[in-house]
Amino acid sequence: MAAVEMGVFDLVGTEGMPEADAASRLGIASRPARGLFDTCVATGLLLREGGTIRSTPAAAKYLASDSEYSLRNYVLDERWCWPAWGRLEEALRSDAPPLPQDDDGYHVFPEEFLLDFLHGHSLAMGELLAETIAFDGVTRVMDVGGGSGAVSIALCRANPSLQAVVVDREEVLVKTREHIERAGLSDRISTRNANVFTDTLPDDCDAAVIASMLHDFSVERAAEILSRVAASLPSGGTLVVMEIAPDDDRGGPVLPAVFTVTMIVNTEGGIAFTRAELKEMIEAAGFEVERDVTLGERYVTTAIEARKR
């Protein structure tokens, strides 16, 4: 995290820089520089050749701030998670997050950080979704709680005739529009300022995507989201839900299991739902589940495709 926060990968890039120059530019002495660079080399983030260090392709793609797929802010998320995780016992005993929440039950992160920190990850997941589930015949998709618009961007890139509308709060959509414009898709992706619990959702879409959102809420609130989305779609409309889902017996994998604890620390009522739980809620909202697939071995993310009755 320190290497990302200090801008090591932005500084050296794939072109490289002598270690001494990099240390000087970073403003750190030779001993801590050696420890930092050695660790980055050992973990596969930097390459060292004759006293010159450079970013590996993976580090350049995911840790440089100017990369479309940058996970830089995702890594820096740890700065804001540490205070909450340090009070884990309190959260477990009280069944409530130890840090302040906003009116919708979200952990209060600095706004400028929150709007960007998942974009690179969501873009990669959206591309996997586009490769896995065909949106043939879909004309307009509603991206519910779409954040930066990354999933809509990925889907529209993969489906040239598809249009999308990102539904989220206006304070989020300010940044969403920047990402859409940067992607050159302003003519195909629009935004809609709406609270999914209280406002009217678009009724001109024949598909909806709910990506990495339901886990922020309790079973009751997640079911309410699904019901409101169902009410806005026509009969036969497509629903795709993406979630980090543990096995049905909750015995693994490790990441989804730990993710539930993350929700306990950071949300009021949030939990990682199993595939069976997701399917049950989706069917109760008025859909027929058609299939579920795992998106990528590393991400342990489930995509469930359903059709409105």
Identify the role of each PLM range.
Residues 1-42, 47-48, 135, 140, ...:
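Alpha-helical subdomain
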Residues 1-6, 10-11, 16, 25, ...:
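Conserved Class I S-adenosyl-L-methionine-dependent methyltransferase catalytic core
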